[in-house]
Amino acid sequence: TPVMANEFSFSFEWGDIPLCTSGHPNIVKNPKFVLSNVPEHTKVISFRLKDLDAPSYDHGGGKITYSGNNEIEPGAFTYKSPCPPGGSHRYVWTATAKEKDSFFGGTIGKAKAMKLYPNK
């Protein structure tokens, strides 16, 4: 879906994670995320990775305290790397912007970004 003007969005690159196609993921540092149009009053952004071709597998994610920096460098959190057996899978990161560091409520924006892995 196209991104509307001023809509919360982000991009990412897999970076230098080890190639993994065994179905047994590694624990790796987050990719670099570049954020755009982060909602006003955002204090925390949580990131979750989902494999659209194996949606029941929990790759995890993490959260960062947002202070206005729109580049999130690798190492902010760790997660289970993409590691599809038998070909590329479609992976989606979801970023959830919150105005408070709370599991319940406070969500003020969501964005998604998808890439294949491996991206051959």
Regions found by a protein language model. Give the residues of each.
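N-terminus-centered regions that define maturation/targeting leaders and the start
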Residues: 2-120
